[in-house]
From Swiss-Prot:
It is found in: Cytoplasm. The gene is murC. This is UDP-N-acetylmuramate--L-alanine ligase. Disulfide bonds: none annotated. It is an enzyme of class 6 (ligase). It catalyses: UDP-N-acetyl-alpha-D-muramate + L-alanine + ATP = UDP-N-acetyl-alpha-D-muramoyl-L-alanine + ADP + phosphate + H(+). ATP binds at G114, T115, H116, G117, K118, T119, S120. GO terms for biological process: cell division; cell wall organization; peptidoglycan biosynthetic process; regulation of cell shape. NCBIfam families: murC. The keyword Signal does not apply. InterPro entries: Mur-like_cat_sf, Mur_ligase_C, Mur_ligase_C_dom_sf, Mur_ligase_cen, Mur_ligase_N, MurCDEF_pg_biosynth, UDP-N-AcMur_Ala_ligase_MurC. Keywords: ATP-binding, Cell cycle, Cell division, Cell shape, Cell wall biogenesis/degradation, Cytoplasm, Ligase, Nucleotide-binding, Peptidoglycan synthesis.
Amino acid sequence: MLDKNKQIWFIGIKGTGMASLALVLHDLGYNVAGSDIEKYTFTQVPLEKAGIEVKDFDPANIKSNDEQVIVKGNAFKQDNPEVAACLDKNVEWQSYPDTVEEIVQMHTSIGVSGTHGKTSTTSLLAHVLGEVAPTSYLIGDGRGKGVADSRFFVYEADEYRRHFLAYHPDYQIMTNIDFDHPDYFKDQDDYTSAFQTAADQTKKALFVWGDDKRLQSLKTDIPKYTYGFKDTDDFQAVNIEKTTTGSKFNVLAHGKDLGRFEIHLFGDHSILNTTAVIAVAYTEKVPMEDIKEGLLTFKGAKRRFAEKDFGDVSVIDDYAHHPTEMRATIQAARQKFPDKELVVVFQPHTFSRTKKYQKDFEEILRDVDKAYVTPIYASAREASGDISSEDLVNNIPGSEVIDLDNIADLTKHKNAVVVFMGAGDIPKYEDAYEKLL
């Protein structure tokens, strides 16, 4: 249980979720510190900026439950020296999800779950609500902020290993249920059942994408509102105008026109995410004029269609690693850069996902102007497999395998948009390429 009279000690404080949570608690006035590996990570920058102490793993860091509340990262087991110290000293710990749930219960809370679009939607919702009321947020890309006396707490709810079932929010946005994490979930039914339980644990209302049949099949005792492009949706985006600077559209709430909204984001998925955000705000009686202003100042989420320009070459960094996400990112790139050559550098993420979606990946990459595939990114829980990047390239005409030693091949593309896609360490490929521009 969180306690402002004790130190909150994070075992694994540099993890993206853990770093975000540490920042939230620090902002809310808790005494936060923690430990992790020595290797530099991007998440330690905001921790250092906030003055949060980060030490190496050491059994001496573990005191007693009278002095500390221990928050243990999900990845750390008994072979970690601090976890071992907790066991030796009979010091109890709590998990990341259980700690987040304590914050969920302190505020009007909105969770964002779904296979795709969680980070983008959470970021947008936190930004828009934060423009009109004190809002704390926790985002899966390493960002978190606590605001004293917050009205809202907006957080990303990750379904992996059913972590999001620790939460009981007031509202929940569910973007889609598209089978993922085949290393953990047995099949689609097993995956969908986790979302059914999450829906059961939501208190006031559920907001779901109207085109997703699995979301439609969820049973709930609370209102379940749909959002999308169809006349049957409770919150419908209409009169859509797409340009190279973004999109404009009206939103109807149960047939009532809430006005015209503008976003500097691209692709149908961005319009859908925005409509979900508008639906939540409308339900909480947030003035629509305030929402319109907030949308205009939103710059986008980290590693979600993040753009840099180098003369006639635009470089996009995107977290897409599932077929649905890849299609959305490619659609967004075509909307913003209709006259440029579309070059995709794709890093497959985990062997099990690559095997499961091999045909989808190949189909998607056959549809771009030029495709490059890096070696498969192996996760800590899955170091090898019976598929390789060469297997994909062999089925994609004109594509090539690319690695750091031949990254210079990308420089032959002029008047191009080069999209780096992946959830692993693909930024190292992007960095190497940008140094050559």
